From Swiss-Prot:
Organism field: Actinobacillus pleuropneumoniae serotype 3 (strain JL03)
Keyword vocabulary terms for this entry: Cell cycle, Cell division, Cell shape, Cell wall biogenesis/degradation, Cytoplasm, Glycosidase, Hydrolase, Peptidoglycan synthesis
EC number: 3.2.1.52
One term under GO cellular component: cytoplasm
PROSITE patterns given in the database record: GLYCOSYL_HYDROL_F3
Main location: cytoplasm
Name of the gene this protein is made from: nagZ
Name recorded for this polypeptide: Beta-hexosaminidase
Length: 345
């Protein structure tokens, strides 16, 4: 039910006990949990061995500025780089697929189950999204996003489309406040929701993460706590039957829904299967003590479906010609992107 974080680069006994709580299903790792590849491998191994139940271990390893593990890992390009710098659509989709495959391979080699990717938000108006987006035009960005997903799926990693139904057209950052999107319903359904709709119809999304955004012309609650968005639209209209993650309930944008227990209750009632609660250790304890909920059999099955099913050895990965070629090209692309941004932004 809950995905939480840990404080540092080693696992404390107190954290072991919290992770063994029946309501905790997994954890998300951050840059503060990472020093180098050797340390990270030891940390993940410690989690797997000391916590006496299967845990979903996750990270945000999108690429560009949202890449928690850097030293010793491939410098992944920002998603906007594919469309902007590629010579033609064929090259942009090939690069995106390489990135999805390589990212998933590197995570599996460290025994990490999934990276929360890809971002399917349109546009770069929101600073929290920016170049994390594949583009502003749904028709142009969809093949690139789908190629990235196909790369992840080839490696066997579950995919998470975020931030439903679209976070790209608000100025506010939901890490800091609750954003309001005042556009007409038709604008959202005719543009922002299209990448989610089409990828769901093709069976390409294992999970969806809703936004902490209030779409004022549609509902009074943030999408992450909205029955309208999660049950009526996502489940019933789009026929999505995968996992629904809440975005981090510790973010300021979730504060609209009340205290931590109330946020969790509203997210569950709205339709979320797994809840992220990060950077709020006291909030985690409050939820574990105060949340009266037993995950359903369906929710448990959805949770298990996200776990890694392929073993990748780092030395074998590094020796692979495909990996070597992809790493070289993608590192160069991200360097090109940083130069491009320096000149044009």
């Amino acid at each position: 039910m809950l995905l939480i974080d840990i404080k540092d680069k080693e696992l404390s006994q107190e954290e072991v006990e919290i992770l063994e709580h029946p309501l905790v299903s997994g954890l998300i790792l951050f840059s503060r949990n990472f020093h180098d590849k050797v340390q990270l491998e030891a940390l993940v191994k410690s989690i797997r061995q000391r916590v006496k139940k299967p845990l979903l271990i996750t990270v945000d390893q999108e690429g560009g500025r949202v890449q928690r593990f850097r030293e010793g890992f491939t410098k992944l390009p920002a998603m906007q780089a594919f469309h902007t710098l590629a010579k033609n659509p064929q090259e942009s989709t090939a690069l995106a697929r390489q990135t999805g495959w390589l990212m998933a391979a590197e995570m599996f080699a460290l025994d990490i189950d999934l990276s929360f990717a890809p971002v399917l938000d349109l546009g770069h108006q929101c600073k929290a999204i920016g170049d994390r987006s594949f583009g502003e035009n749904p028709d142009a960005m969809l093949p690139i996003a789908e190629a990235f997903i196909d790369g992840m799926r080839e490696m066997g990693m579950a995919t998470t489309g975020k931030h439903f139904p679209g976070h790209g057209h608000v100025l506010a950052d939901s890490h800091l406040e609750t954003p309001f999107d005042d556009r007409p319903k038709e604008a959202i359904f005719n543009r922002d929701i299209l990448p989610f709709k089409q990828l769901i119809s093709k069976g390409k999304l294992s999970a969806v993460m809703p936004a902490h955004v209030i779409y004022t012309q549609c509902d009074s609650q943030p999408a992450s706590g909205s029955e309208y968005w999660l049950k009526q639209v996502l489940r019933n209209q789009l026929n999505f039957n995968g996992v629904i993650f809440s975005d981090d309930l510790g973010m300021k944008g979730a504060g609209f829904m009340g205290n931590f227990v109330e946020r969790s209750e509203k997210a569950i009632h709205a339709g979320c299967d797994l809840l992220l609660l990060c950077n709020e250790p006291e909030g985690v304890i409050q939820v574990l003590d105060g949340l009266k909920y037993q995950p359903t059999k369906t929710q448990t099955e959805r949770h298990i479906s996200l776990m890694k099913r392929k073993t990748v050895r780092w030395n074998e990965l590094e020796a692979s010609p495909r990996y070597q070629q992809a790493q070289q090209r993608l590192t160069a692309l991200q360097n090109e992107w940083l130069e491009y941004k320096a000149q044009h932004c």
